[in-house]
Amino acid sequence: MKIKVYSLEGEAIDEMELPEIFNEEFRPDVIKRAVLSAQTARVQPWGPDPMAGKRTSAQSYGAGRGVAMVPRIKNGSRAAFVPQAVGGRRAHPPRPQKNYHERINRKERRLAIRSAVAATARKDLVEARGHRIENVPQLPLVVDDELSMIKRTADTREVFRKLGIMDDIVRAREGKKIRAGKGKMRGRKYRTPRGPLIVVGDDKGITRGARNHPGVDVVRVENLNAELLAPGTHPGRLTVFTRSAIEKLDELFQ
């Protein structure tokens, strides 16, 4: 199947053969496993001090005193050590030694990447994620390698407008909301929707040029992963490939 290659002006300048990776079977189950594996690999173990609430000589008086048989401090009636006592240990706390990482086989992870790449060419999946693609000329969108050389935000804004993906960036900007819950107190005050993903063969400045656009991610094709292609385990992210990047896909993820 032939696809068009677009210039920075949004005009078709060439054609190329669509890589075989875009014929991969759609496997949302494998994609979800790969994304969860990447997310859980970043989980930092947490839990209380093993001796918290236990640094006391409190002992139970035993039966026959007419009071509950909980451990009590010496020469007093105050309870200690037990979970229901003030300053006592925690009942069933999180364990630092627990392994949260959901591992995945190497071949399974590569299958997930291939399937997620193929999903970027399906209009129904891209629209189901909420992306605005009314003005996008084709999926997958392939652009000349000059895109990777742009270093200024104003220049990338103009290029994105001509390529038809600016509508999706506006959606991400307008969708920025204050996060619900305590995360807003922990350096994660805002939640921004995911916008377009830019996949380049070689980064010659596009990261600097695109980093101020809300929701936009830039990645070299060698570092492509399932989490970038399917944020939140939902495949079908609006993706822009440079010509050199799309030519390397079959070789890297066969």
From Swiss-Prot:
Query: Which is a GO BP term held by this UniProt record?
Result: translation
KW Ribosomal protein (keyword) present: yes
GO MF terms on file?
rRNA binding; structural constituent of ribosome
Pfam family for this entry, one: Ribosomal_L4
Keyword tags: Ribonucleoprotein, Ribosomal protein, RNA-binding, rRNA-binding
What are its GO cellular component terms? ribonucleoprotein complex; ribosome
**Which InterPro entries does the entry mention?**
Ribosomal_uL4, Ribosomal_uL4_dom_sf, Ribosomal_uL4_euk/arc_CS, Ribosomal_uL4_euk/arch, Ribosomall_uL4-arc
Record function comment? One of the primary rRNA binding proteins, this protein initially binds near the 5'-end of the 23S rRNA. It is important during the early stages of 50S assembly. It makes multiple contacts with different domains of the 23S rRNA in the assembled 50S subunit and ribosome.
Oligomeric state and partners? Part of the 50S ribosomal subunit.
Q: Which NCBIfam families match?
A: rpl4p_arch
UniProt lists the family membership as follows: Belongs to the universal ribosomal protein uL4 family.
Protein name in the entry? Large ribosomal subunit protein uL4
Species assigned in the record: Methanothermobacter thermautotrophicus (strain ATCC 29096 / DSM 1053 / JCM 10044 / NBRC 100330 / Delta H)
